[in-house]
Amino acid sequence: MSVSFENTATNRGVVTFTIGQDKIQPALDQAFNKVKKNLNVPGFRKGHIPRAVFNQKFGEEALYDDALNAILPAAYEAAIAELGLDVVAQPKIDVKSIGKGQDWTLTAEVVTKPEVKLGAYKDLEVSVEVSKEVTDEEVDAKLENERKNLAELIVKDGAAEYGDTVVIDFVGSVDGVEFDGGKGENHSLELGSGQFIPGFEDQLVGAKSGDEVEVKVTFPEDYQATDLAGKAAVFVTKVNEVKAKEVPALDDELAKDLDDEVDTLDELKAKYRKELEAAKEIAFDDAVEGAALDLAVENAEIVELPAEMVENEVHRAMNEFMGNLQRQGISPEMYFQITGTTQEDLRKQYEADSDKRVKTNLVIEAVAAAEGFDATDEEIQKEINDLAAEYNMEVSQVSELLSPEMLKHDIAMKKAVEVITSSAKVK
């Protein structure tokens, strides 16, 4: 096979390659055997037309598309491998010369991985705003949050306050006309929770049981029900009950209720402190990793980032996110409905930092190459086992989905990140 490469721009070029008759003829034979099965030609049984008759009647050219589709992927990959190119996007293939008895010549417009010139990536000095210290106030705050979760709602006399729950009947109308979904009975609403549209809950503060309040609001411009968006509405609201939260006493009994592994409040606080310390340790390490990677990228020189790489990263991130949702039993449609967003909103979210993610990955790959990182069979098997456990999959499923080369790449990347972060020094 003849192969050549012409550089047309930074990280772009054209690969010209030929496919020889040793590959073409078997592919034509295979294409003929596939096509003839469905051919009805007078004088021959279905599927038994001789090759010579087929060529005379239809022409060998009728087989070219099927034959080319069969051999093109391997021929293209062989050409790329021979040239040692690292292609990062789908090529644009063009047939230049194809005919009977001759080698076929094709071109492929390709986008190649940009060159990365590494700067300093070890012993980096970084600053992080995350502290590993756990204060008494943080322990008390966690305890108070857990205590509030055990609060009971008790009917109270007097005016409703923020944090109270009101049980209400309501009927909404726009220009005096009731609308679908604007009516409810015995609905429990915590004031200040933000469950209802802005301004609704505020107007019930101060109301008492038995009061009837005309709540006047305006639907947000981006309200999910487009027929109501931006419109003024009135909700005639009757307050049936006002309930206040009654939290349990802060004592050893509370500690036992919150955690059956402790007997006293002091033991519970000690346990919470350890949990907070562990969480802060992880947050601190993540912050150091992020800062070190950012600095390593800043120190590196990347020659023109191809737009295709950024676009591929957006697609990859979105697909990964959607896959994680579906593993939790949440369909894309359900997610967009719950969040009030669209696929375009999600795309914009991932586009925002896709450029940074691509550059970071390129630098990590360059570090892995510079350090000569590889993966042993034992490391690959451990990675498979870890992924199977993380995603609740069978080990065999993970092995089928991920090739050894993909796993080696991921392991080398992890080693490179470890080299960058483990040597980093926090200012």
UniProtKB/Swiss-Prot annotation:
EC id: 5.2.1.8
Its GO CC terms? cytoplasm
Query: Which locations, inside or outside the cell, does it occupy?
Result: Cytoplasm
GO biological process assignments: 'de novo' cotranslational protein folding; cell division; chaperone-mediated protein folding; protein transport; protein unfolding
SUPFAM superfamilies referenced in this protein's UniProt entry, alphabetically: FKBP-like, Triger factor/SurA peptide-binding domain-like, Trigger factor ribosome-binding domain
Residues crossing the lipid bilayer are none
Chief subcellular location: cytoplasm
GO-annotated molecular function: peptidyl-prolyl cis-trans isomerase activity; protein folding chaperone; ribosome binding
Q: What is known of its domains?
A: Consists of 3 domains; the N-terminus binds the ribosome, the middle domain has PPIase activity, while the C-terminus has intrinsic chaperone activity on its own.
**Its job:** Involved in protein export. Acts as a chaperone by maintaining the newly synthesized protein in an open conformation. Functions as a peptidyl-prolyl cis-trans isomerase.
Q: What is this protein called?
A: Trigger factor
Organism whose genome encodes this protein: Streptococcus thermophilus (strain ATCC BAA-491 / LMD-9)
